[in-house]
């Protein structure tokens, strides 16, 4: 596989990631910060099912720090998703490099405390977490598996933007 074909495969993977992230953000994640009357009962039921099935304490009773991440997702990330999807599906859009690096760094930074909390928080003693909680290490790993793609794909994006020769190349503008 040539360099162009490999680059296009990664761009398509990234495009799919950003397209898939739009409904997840709108219909699941933002229920924690937007008024409940904005959502049909089916979406509320879906969130309730997910929270109980996976014992996700962050989505059952979101702590304030987690809500701040979701607010950033609403204000900064959600508007970026269709722009990034367009750029990666179209391909060869060097202008996406800096915004993609900013997005990736921001997302990776937010996922670190989320994953750390899911792995190491003593939910039995934590006042902020009510409802069902992961009780076994296996349940914690299952939850980490749900959140991990949102760390791994931005990490791939970051490395792709920093290391791919096509995106590293800076076009010199002609002087008039």
UniProtKB/Swiss-Prot annotation:
Q: How does it sit in the membrane?
A: Multi-pass membrane protein
Q: Which UniProt keywords apply?
A: Endoplasmic reticulum, Membrane, Nucleus, Transmembrane, Transmembrane helix
One GO BP on record is:
positive regulation of lipoprotein transport
Check the record and name the InterPro entries matching this protein.
Answer: EXPERA, Sigma-2_receptor-like, Sigma2_recept
Alphabetically, the GO molecular function entries are: cholesterol binding; oxysterol binding
What are the transmembrane regions? 10-30, 69-89, 100-120, 141-161
Q: Name one Pfam family in it.
A: EBP
Residue intervals annotated with topology Cytoplasmic: 1-9, 90-99, 162-176
> Does Nucleus show up as a keyword for this record?
yes
Additional facts recorded:
Sigma receptors are classified into two subtypes (Sigma-1 and Sigma-2) based on their different pharmacological profile. Sigma-2 receptors are identified by radioligand-binding studies as a binding site with high affinity for di-o-tolylguanidine (DTG) and haloperidol.
What is the protein name stated in its UniProt record?
Answer: Sigma intracellular receptor 2
Q: Which organism is it from?
A: Mus musculus (Mouse)
What is the gene name?
Tmem97
């Amino acid at each position: 596989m040539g360099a162009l074909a490999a680059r296009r495969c990664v761009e398509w993977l990234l495009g799919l990631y950003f397209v898939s992230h739009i409904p997840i953000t709108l219909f699941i994640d933002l229920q924690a910060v937007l008024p409940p009357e904005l959502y049909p009962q089916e979406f509320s039921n879906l969130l309730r099912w997910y929270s109980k099935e996976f014992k996700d304490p962050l989505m059952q009773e979101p702590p304030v720090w987690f809500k701040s991440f979701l607010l950033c997702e609403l204000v900064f990330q959600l508007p970026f998703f269709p722009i990034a999807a367009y750029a990666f599906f179209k391909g060869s859009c060097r202008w996406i490099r800096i915004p993609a690096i900013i997005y990736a760094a921001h997302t990776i930074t937010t996922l670190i405390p989320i994953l750390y909390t899911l792995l190491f928080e003593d939910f039995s003693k934590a006042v902020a977490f009510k409802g069902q909680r992961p009780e076994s290490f296996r349940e914690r790993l299952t939850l980490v598996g749900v959140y991990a793609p949102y760390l791994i794909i931005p990490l791939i994006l970051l490395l792709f933007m920093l290391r791919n020769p096509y995106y590293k190349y800076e076009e010199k503008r002609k002087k008039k």
